[in-house]
Regions:
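Bilobed periplasmic-binding protein-like "clamshell/Venus-flytrap" ligand-binding domains
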Residues: 3-6, 48-84
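Periplasmic binding protein-like
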Residues: 1-24, 56
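Short, solvent-exposed loop/beta-turn-alpha elements that line the ligand-binding surface or hinge
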Residues: 16-46, 75-105
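Extracytoplasmic/secreted proteins, especially bacterial periplasmic and envelope-associated proteins
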Residues: 13, 36-43, 52-59, 63
Length: 105
């Protein structure tokens, strides 16, 4: 079986992508499951220490990559031409921009 799908991160955090592999996640369309993966993601969600959280996500990602339940084939890229007279615009990882902060010189 093969399926093509797309996902754009809802927020700037590894969990926005890695939580998709959790067994009972409604967006886990592959029905993939791994006994060590789910607890790692759950621990990372509860952990306050950023370094520990990063390590947990890193370990979970290694499992995901070794199993390859999904195969990324492309990623979104956005190009913008911003006139130098526009101020208050800045690039954003989530491609969201507070246009109320824009101004013209």
């Amino acid at each position: 079986d093969i399926l093509r799908a797309a996902w754009f991160g809802d927020y700037n955090d590894p969990n926005t992508f890695l939580s998709l592999g959790v067994t009972d996640n409604g967006n886990n369309h592959t029905n993939w499951s791994h006994p060590r993966y789910d607890p790692l993601i759950e621990q990372a969600a509860r952990t306050q220490d950023p370094k520990v959280r990063h390590k947990l996500f890193e370990e979970a990602e290694k499992i995901l990559i070794s199993q390859m339940p999904v195969i990324p084939i492309y990623f979104y890229v956005t190009s913008r031409l911003i006139d130098p007279s526009v101020t208050g615009w800045y690039p954003s990882l989530l491609d969201t921009h507070p246009y109320q902060a824009l101004d013209l010189k």
